[in-house]
């Protein structure tokens, strides 16, 4: 059985989670919204065109919307990530980059040349956030060019400047960009918690379970939207 986690600040409240409850202070916590773009959550977006099942995306959008309302009211910083590249795909890397070979978006465009310039390119519909989850005043938007939100981005400096130590993750895909960003945060001494029903995998259902197992066993904690809203929704709104 795990030992109780020592709160990092006096403002912490205990968030029910696996493998044990985790102390979270809203003032030092950010909700990280991973890649809730048309590419990953809308019919006709990259994941859909690449043959992945996105049927769970609508529920994830609904769950994230409720989480963000509570998070903002509790005084948490909300940070949105958008994954993609410039419209010439210079940022994606050429054949000398493993990203060029492993990115399913790039592979899909090579297989279907008519899609070239449309998938995950800034300025295109595919890159844009879904309409239901547009940022609000005070939210932060960041761009990333690889699976991890910490790679070549401003995320670490943005968090440190605000004294943020705990990251709550929502978004798509659990087994790719969510897990990659949480793992890199772990290596930089950030506490990471994923809300399992506010995420969705790219691939079969077993990869969702595997990603959550990895997170709760080795890199962070797993909670639910109900527990998050139940814990922080009762706090007095912060201005």
From Swiss-Prot:
The keyword Hydrolase applies. It catalyses: (Z)-3-ureidoacrylate + H2O + H(+) = (Z)-3-aminoacrylate + NH4(+) + CO2; (Z)-3-ureidoacrylate + H2O = (Z)-3-aminoacrylate + carbamate + H(+); (Z)-2-methylureidoacrylate + H2O + H(+) = (Z)-2-methylaminoacrylate + NH4(+) + CO2. GO terms for molecular function: hydrolase activity, acting on carbon-nitrogen (but not peptide) bonds, in linear amides. Its EC number is 3.5.1.110. Keywords: Hydrolase. CDD domains: cysteine_hydrolases. Pfam families: Isochorismatase. PANTHER family: ISOCHORISMATASE-LIKE DOMAIN-CONTAINING PROTEIN (PTHR43540:SF6), PEROXYUREIDOACRYLATE/UREIDOACRYLATE AMIDOHYDROLASE-RELATED (PTHR43540). This is Ureidoacrylate amidohydrolase RutB. It comes from Caulobacter segnis (strain ATCC 21756 / DSM 7131 / JCM 7823 / NBRC 15250 / LMG 17158 / TK0059). The lineage of its organism: Bacteria, Pseudomonadati, Pseudomonadota, Alphaproteobacteria, Caulobacterales. The gene is rutB.
